[in-house]
Amino acid sequence: MSRLIEHILRKAKNNKVIKKAYQSTVNSYLNSHIGEITPFNPRSTSFEKRRINLLVPSINQEHLFGGISTAINFFDQLYKYEQDSFRRIITTDAAPNSEDLLKFSGYTHVSSENDVDGNSQIVSFNDRYNKTIPVGKEDIFIATSWWTAYFAQRIVKWQAEFYTQKPKRIIYFIQDFEPGFYSWSSQYSLALSTYLYKGEQIAVFNSSLLKNFFNNHGYKFTEEYYFEPKLNSSLKKHLISFDKMEKKKKILIYGRPSVARNAFALIVESLRIWVWTQPNADQWEVISAGEHHSDVEIGNGVVIKSKGKMSLEDYANELKESALGVSLMISPHPSYPPLEMAHFGILVLTNNYENKNLSELHHNIYSLDNISPDSIAAQLTKLCTEFEGNKKAGDKESMADYLSEGEQFLFIQELSEKLK
């Protein structure tokens, strides 16, 4: 039988008709474009006032959390020191609808085709094929992702050439090592190239851990600043003293199957081992929060129940009730869920990554070098035993700066001066 199959394959390889059909099929699926860098073409304008531009993928409600929310907060804080300037938010990947714009009541939504001088504008530029956007001689750009940095770097080059002036400084708001979002590929190389830009670029890092990672790898910027994470102000309203929390035999996992760096499959495989090593696994409830997915049966009568993307109030209630947490982030960014869980009295399992070790930040965090399923399952069993022996095991001192109401971007006035 195997010889017959080999004979058929040899004949097929030499058949011109089959070859042509195969090539036609391959070509029909061939993608020679990189969607993220769809040309972002500027055009000249008579507008000469200083204007701060935030380049952000989206401001839609479904995206307005985590990194984008932090970037907009930074933009708002910077504008407090730029009162003589105009401001503009440019969305590159998605257009907001009327409901999305309710959170931006101080802004006017304008078309890129209109050259409007008004202040506080939102311009949707996701549908930009064969379109241009007005860029003046005093426009300054803040990039929030590798592709928006790619755009900004090209824009300031055009701006300098067209208006015959020195290239403007770019602010690069860096919240992770973004080449790591891709396998070795075109996108990997493009993301990396934005850190190697030869022009003047001010880096603002989300955490000293991330800044140190970049420094350790030899990436250099004109100026460098960093800020440390703080507990979400809305979530903080639900934070109560540990004594008032009713901790249950509940494990809360940060489950985002579509985000590779959160290692959802690895967490599930670890739990499949844990259910057979934990003597009373069927007494524990396992909840997944972050992104909706089907419930997952992991054996021994235990099911991972998906709660998806929860409201802050519902998420806070899960934090108050859960005894243990598992949240992985295969990147140098510290990640918010482990810190949130720890401050709500949860014993949290996470991972180290190069210079990142979150166990140094809070005693409720257990950060592993080896995150094989066996290693995670073994540590989870230890934490179950610790909680069952002491229901107050998670009652540990908080990070004062993380909970403080103080200014997050302490450097922002100095940065504003560097732009002038």
Question: What do the PLM-derived regions correspond to, one by one?
Answer:
Residues 346-351:
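Short hydrophobic beta-strand element within catalytic cores of glycosyltransferases
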Residues 371, 385-420:
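A charged, aromatic-enriched C-terminal amphipathic alpha-helix characteristic of glycosyltransferases
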Residues 130-137, 185-203:
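Membrane-proximal helix-turn-helix segments that form the acceptor-binding/catalytic region
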Residues 139, 320-333:
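Acidic donor-binding loop of glycosyltransferase active sites
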Residues 151-152, 181-183, 187, 199-223:
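A short, active-site helix/loop in glycosyltransferases that binds the activated sugar's phosphate group
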